[in-house]
Regions:
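Compositionally biased, low-complexity intrinsically disordered regions
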Residues: 24, 32-34, 106
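Glycine-/charge-enriched secondary-structure boundary and capping motifs
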Residues: 1-13, 17-18, 60, 80, ...
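Residue-level signal for inorganic ion chemistry
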Residues: 53, 93, 101, 141, ...
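Internal active-site segments that recognize and position negatively charged phosphoryl groups
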Residues: 181-184, 224-251
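Alpha-helical scaffold segments that flank or form the walls of functional sites
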Residues: 84-100
């Protein structure tokens, strides 16, 4: 790669040009069709200026989130293709915006890399992953920064979104009697990490075709998480969710975060947890516990949300092909946060990811 200015010029030109279908390659992990980047009339200045400038929208409130990915803490260069790393860097921030019931609009990606990495195609492939995901959700890359590091790669992702004024979904709105729902399935993000730690790679050749597909599905839930942007928008704009959080740290930890913020307790039923069936099958072979992965593993990036009983019939069954499952009920704070398994009930303590 040439210098930073050349890279910025190339990135700006790519973001601004009118694009249709994409490049060849990465067929098993790249969407087959690429949508054009949405260029909003609200954007006054983007990539190439000292800062981005955009007009505020009347009747809207701005939602902003930031996420930091650090090599050897959040990912390993040896097991994460740069395209997928770019995808995940943006996906984790889109998941936060979805958890607020907001619509994502703008993104800024900053990256620090060692000089030997800068001299390869790594950074371009990383931004390919960012831009492909951004295109899918009409998000425009409007800036960021690049810098040199001594050893490890560091990626900072900032995403800005909008919600109708007064309609952002917070963690603080749950009340006793609300039903607790999750999108999608649980456990695959953590199972994928366990497989990577044990040396698994995409499309392992020593397995049969069906087993390889199952393994790749689990690995990609870790390497290429899918943010539930559509569900977030529906739950926010239709005023369906009373509270919401994304499942990045693990169900046990994130449910406790939500209950603490709302000043409530909760009871969930382990039999109702939508554990990915491929995870259950894998755990039987690899001496892993699917319930523990679903409760404490984290990195599923599903949405956990609460709904008043009267609003449950209004919930769509699926959004963007993803369903939901009721897993329990919000209770009074005196009841604590608990989980049941048959006749047995116990306290569900936070057991997920801890940053420090």
């Amino acid at each position: 790669m040439k210098g930073e200015s050349d890279f910025i010029d190339a990135l700006r030109n790519r973001v601004n040009r009118d694009r249709g279908t994409g490049r060849q390659g990465e067929t098993e992990i790249t969407p087959s069709a690429r949508l054009p980047v949405t260029v909003s009339a609200s954007l006054i200045a983007g990539i190439g200026d000292d800062a981005a400038v955009f007009r505020s929208t009347a009747g809207k409130e701005t939602v902003i989130t930031a996420d930091l990915l650090v090599e050897d803490i959040d990912f390993r260069r040896t097991t994460t293709p740069p395209y997928l790393l770019g995808h995940k860097a943006l996906a984790v921030s889109l998941s936060d915006i979805a958890a607020m019931g907001a619509r994502p609009l703008w993104s800024m990606i900053s990256i620090g890399v060692p000089e030997d990495v800068w001299q390869t195609e790594f950074v371009e492939r990383l931004y390919d992953g960012v831009l492909d995901l951004a295109n899918r959700y009409g998000v425009q890359l409007i800036g960021g920064d690049t810098s040199r590091t001594n050893d490890n790669i560091v990626i900072d992702s900032i995403v800005t979104g909008e919600a109708t004024a007064g309609m952002s979904v917070l963690r603080t709105g749950a009340s006793a009697g609300d039903q607790i729902f999750v999108t999608g399935s649980l456990g695959a993000g953590a199972a994928g990490l366990r497989l990577i730690e044990r040396g698994a790679h995409l499309a392992e050749q020593n397995l049969g075709d069906e087993d390889s597909q199952k393994l790749d599905h689990i690995l990609l839930r870790q390497l290429r998480p899918e943010p539930r942007v559509g569900w977030g928008i529906v739950l926010g704009e239709e005023r369906l969710a009373t509270s919401m959080i994304d499942l990045s740290d693990g169900l046990s930890s994130d449910l406790n975060h939500l209950c603490t913020a709302s000043g409530v307790g909760a009871l969930i039923d382990s039999a109702l947890l939508p554990i990915d069936e491929r995870v259950t099958e894998l755990c039987g072979r690899r001496a892993l516990d699917p319930l523990q992965l679903a409760l404490h593993g984290g990195e599923d990036f599903e949405l956990l949300f609460t709904v008043k009983p009267a609003d449950v019939p209004r919930l769509p069954r699926r959004v963007d092909g993803v369903g939901i499952k009721c897993i329990g009920t919000i209770q009074s704070t005196s009841e604590g946060v608990k989980i049941s398994e048959g006749p047995r009930t116990w306290e569900l303590k936070p057991g997920g990811w801890k940053h420090f």
